[in-house]
């Protein structure tokens, strides 16, 4: 990513976080993990993490898709003096934290498992 797209992505991540926190209070807890912007700044891919059951997470994603135009409008009001055109928003669910937590659980199980010395091969 170029320096420009990185700066734009960082700004969008900050502003979207503020929008979710201040202007969309009914939206459940959503963490913006990352924002990736295309080179032409036409599309912003917003990767989010949510807490809850898979059904709740699906409902949150559906809610964000329904509110997409409204969120973009709020974003436009906040950054319109910095951009000629506000990027289209695409929301994606990020499962990185869930995978990391699962790996941690597996590692803790391995650490707790008793080691049978009779079965370990000697070199």
From Swiss-Prot:
One of its GO terms (cellular component) is cytosol. It is found in: Cytoplasm. One of its GO terms (molecular function) is ribosomal small subunit binding. It holds the Pfam family RBFA. SUPFAM superfamilies: Ribosome-binding factor A, RbfA. GO terms for biological process: maturation of SSU-rRNA. It comes from the Bacteria. Keywords: Cytoplasm, Ribosome biogenesis. Monomer. Binds 30S ribosomal subunits, but not 50S ribosomal subunits or 70S ribosomes. Belongs to the RbfA family. One of several proteins that assist in the late maturation steps of the functional core of the 30S ribosomal subunit. Associates with free 30S ribosomal subunits (but not with 30S subunits that are part of 70S ribosomes or polysomes). Required for efficient processing of 16S rRNA. May interact with the 5'-terminal helix region of 16S rRNA. This is Ribosome-binding factor A. It comes from Chlorobium chlorochromatii (strain CaD3).
């Amino acid at each position: 990513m170029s320096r420009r797209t990185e700066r734009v992505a960082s700004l969008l991540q900050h502003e979207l976080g503020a929008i979710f926190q201040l202007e969309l209070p009914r939206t459940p807890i959503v963490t913006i993990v990352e924002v990736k912007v295309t080179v032409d700044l036409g599309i912003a891919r917003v990767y989010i993490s949510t807490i809850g059951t898979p059904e709740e997470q699906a409902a949150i994603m559906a809610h964000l898709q329904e509110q997409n135009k409204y969120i973009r409008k709020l974003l436009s009001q906040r950054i319109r003096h910095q951009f000629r055109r506000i990027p289209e928003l695409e929301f994606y669910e990020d499962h990185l934290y869930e995978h990391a937590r699962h790996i941690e659980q597996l590692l803790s199980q391995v650490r707790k498992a008793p080691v049978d010395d009779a079965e370990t091969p000697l070199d």
